[in-house]
Structures are given as structure tokens and as C-alpha cells.
């Protein structure tokens, strides 16, 4: 079915969960007033990104008052939100929730934690162990968190699991100059476009803005059609409220015109990956 999605390109305050929750609620109210069906927030929207030793201080259990409040807000609009999750055994995850009709439809824990260059996630966080598609009012979705999308297998697994829409939550820093754009922006635009085109799927990409410890996050949130075309894209380096009309007909047309997923041979892929795993284990 057709639906309207909002990409909430915000600038979270580092370590300030209460302030961020208030700002997030304001964006949700604005999206509901605009008659949107879904709102997508960036990675770690509730806490900010470069947390380091603050991780245990900002972590939330899924039954915390803050999460329960967001669940209640989802009775009027579907919500995707990034936060630091504390598990029952006191592990901390970079997680994302998909909330709909007053329930948690899906919880994704970031699998690939970057620990190079600017990034140090593995020092403070545990990694997730699965990629699973899930059903929503708007079809079958899959969620990825930033670095997850740079691993081809992640998007492929979700597509093979039936996802026709991929949501990627991101906290991508601005790096490099590429003509009139940023190198990091150009790289992400190529990645999201190629993923959508090869997997005949839609991509909703929500990236944050603002500064933390002198690092600037670049924004540029966008909706990419199954053809790989960017339908709408947010501003660079400043907050934005991007509204995207997601057309089911475009998905149907692209899958008829270029049936990549129909012709994908999952069993050959599994067979060859198993062969490689066996050979490496010798």
C-alpha cells in the first residue's frame, strides 16, 4: 500500500535523554499533524552518538518509562527510533525499535560495530546477532543501523527474508570534499541507490546532524525508489523534516521491469557460502 514517511533529521544532544525525548515527541506530533503514517529517526536519536563511558548512563530497557511513552505515541503513527538498549543480562546494544499501534513490532541490534578511525563502538557495546524482516501495516520491512548497510550480506539477507522496504538509521560524520558535496554524502548516496536497485526495494535513510566533540554529522536523509532514484533528499548539515510519499505502484513496476529478486537463486548462494565456510575450516 502507499504510505507517507517522514525522515526526522534532528541533532540530538549528547547524553541528554530527557531533552532528546522531548524533541522527538515534538517531531512525532508534527508528523501526525502532517498526516504522515511513519516517522523515522536517526541512529541513537535518544542519546547522541559519541557516548563512550556515558553508555550505561543513557541506556534504556525496553520496559523503561521513556520507551513505554514512545510505544503509546505509536498508536497514532508508526515510529522507528534509535537508542542504547540495556538487556536483562546488563549488556548494552546500539538498537532500533519499530513501534506501531501501541506495540513493539521489531527490535534490531546493530550487528556491525565500527571500531576504526573516528569510531570505537566495540569498546562500549555488544553486537547483535541477526537480521530479520518483519511485517508492518505497510508491507514487510527490514532495519539496518549505519555500518550494517556497508556489509552487502545484511541487505541481501533482509531482501531474501521478504523485505520490500529497508530502513537505515545513521549517525554518519561529514568527511572529505567531493566537488560540491561531501565525500561521505557521495558514498552513502551511491550505497543506498545501488542497494535499492540491486534488491528491487525501497530505502528510507535517516541521518542526523549537529556537532559532537568537534565532529559534524552531515544529514542528507533520503527516500530512494526501487529504481535507485533518489525521490527526495534532506538538507546537508542542518535539521530538516523530509516528507516522502512511498508509492506501491513504483515497487510493482520496477519488479516487473527488472526482476532481480525474482531470479535470485538463494540455494546456489547458500551452497557456495557453505563450501567457502567448509574450506576455511579445514
Where are these regions (language model features)?
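A short C-terminal boundary segment appended to hydrolase-like catalytic domains
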Residues: 249-282
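Short beta-strand scaffold segments in enzyme catalytic cores
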Residues: 81-83, 94-98, 132, 221-223, ...
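Extreme N-terminal starter segment of soluble prokaryotic enzymes
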Residues: 1-7
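Short polar catalytic/cofactor-binding loops
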Residues: 9-15
Amino acid at each position: 500500500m502507499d504510505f507517507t514517511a517522514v525522515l526526522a533529521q534532528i541533532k540530538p544532544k549528547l547524553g541528554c535523554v530527557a531533552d532528546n525525548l522531548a524533541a522527538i515527541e515534538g517531531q512525532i506530533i508534527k508528523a501526525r499533524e502532517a498526516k504522515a503514517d511513519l516517522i523515522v529517526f536517526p541512529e541513537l536519536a535518544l542519546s547522541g552518538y559519541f557516548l563512550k563511558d556515558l553508555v550505561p548512563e543513557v541506556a534504556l530497557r525496553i520496559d523503561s518509562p521513556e520507551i513505554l511513552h514512545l510505544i503509546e505515541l505509536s498508536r497514532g503513527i508508526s515510529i522507528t527510533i534509535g537508542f542504547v538498549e540495556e538487556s536483562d543480562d546488563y549488556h548494552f546494544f546500539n538498537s532500533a525499535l519499530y513501534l506501531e499501534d501501541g506495540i513493539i513490532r521489531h527490535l534490531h541490534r546493530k550487528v556491525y560495530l565500527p571500531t576504526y578511525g573516528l569510531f570505537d563502538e566495540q569498546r562500549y557495546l555488544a553486537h547483535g546477532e541477526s537480521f530479520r524482516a518483519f511485517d508492518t501495516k505497510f508491507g514487510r520491512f527490514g532495519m539496518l543501523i549505519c555500518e550494517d548497510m556497508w556489509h552487502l550480506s545484511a541487505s541481501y539477507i533482509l531482501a531474501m527474508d521478504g523485505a520490500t522496504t529497508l530502513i537505515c538509521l545513521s549517525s554518519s560524520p561529514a568527511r572529505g570534499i567531493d566537488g560540491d558535496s561531501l565525500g561521505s554524502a557521495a558514498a552513502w548516496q551511491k550505497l543506498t541507490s545501488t542497494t535499492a536497485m540491486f534488491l528491487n526495494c525501497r530505502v528510507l535513510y535517516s541521518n542526523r546532524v549537529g556537532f559532537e566533540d568537534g565532529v559534524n554529522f552531515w544529514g542528507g536523509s533520503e527516500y530512494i525508489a526501487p529504481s535507485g532514484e533518489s525521490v527526495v533528499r534532506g538538507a546537508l548539515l542542518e535539521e530538516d523534516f523530509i516528507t516522502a510519499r512511498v508509492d506501491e505502484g513504483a515497487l510493482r513496476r520496477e519488479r516487473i521491469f527488472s526482476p532481480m529478486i525474482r531470479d535470485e537463486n538463494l540455494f546456489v548462494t547458500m551452497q557456495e557460502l557453505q563450501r567457502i565456510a567448509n574450506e576455511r575450516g579445514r
